Regions:
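Alpha-helix C-terminal capping segments
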Residues: 41, 48-60, 82
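Conserved N-terminal subdomain of the carbohydrate kinase-like
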Residues: 60-129
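Generic non-transmembrane alpha-helix signal with a bias for helix starts/N-cap capping motifs
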Residues: 46-47, 73
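Gly/Ser/Thr-rich helix-start
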Residues: 20, 44-46, 67
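Short pre-catalytic strand/loop immediately N-terminal to key active-site residues, enriched for Gly-Thr
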Residues: 34-43
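Short secondary-structure capping/turn segments at boundaries of alpha-helices and beta-strands
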Residues: 4-5, 49-50, 94, 107
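Positively charged, low-complexity intrinsically disordered leader regions
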Residues: 1-33
Length: 131
């Protein structure tokens, strides 16, 4: 078996990532348990690589993922676009309106400070990655 790669100048993208993109909720300097508000970001292991290469090195990036066709899913989609990643390969999945069939995964991340390490809590129940 052999793999033939096209030259870079004949490719539309430098990197295409495949995986779940979640809504990341950041309580800034606070703990998740005591936070009264959160900053929102998009994130996912594979996606973060493409976004980083796009933002830092100007690489052409796209993501293959699925998002729920509701306000939270569209927020994540807008954040993907603002992050410089092409969103044309997003599959939009209908929502039941209450999250009983499918919903956008959530990730809460506390920043680490000094000796306090970062803490992450994911809520991925019924997210697209599990269906």
């Amino acid at each position: 078996m052999s793999i033939t790669l096209r030259p870079a100048d004949r490719c539309r993208y430098d990197i295409v990532s495949l995986g779940e993109v979640m809504l990341r909720l950041d309580p800034r300097e606070r703990r998740i348990r005591t936070a009264k508000s959160f900053d929102v970001w998009e994130g996912g292991g594979e996606y973060n690589v493409g976004r980083g290469l796009s933002r830092v090195f100007g690489k052409r990036a796209a993501v293959i993922t699925g998002l729920v066709d509701d306000p939270v899913g569209h927020l994540v989609g807008d954040l993907i676009t603002a992050g410089g990643v092409d969103d044309q390969f997003i599959t939009w999945v209908p929502s039941d309106g209450v999250g009983r069939t499918v919903r956008t995964g959530l990730n809460f991340t506390e920043r680490g400070f000094g000796v306090r390490g970062a803490v992450g809590v994911s809520d991925r129940g019924l997210s697209l990655i599990h269906i």
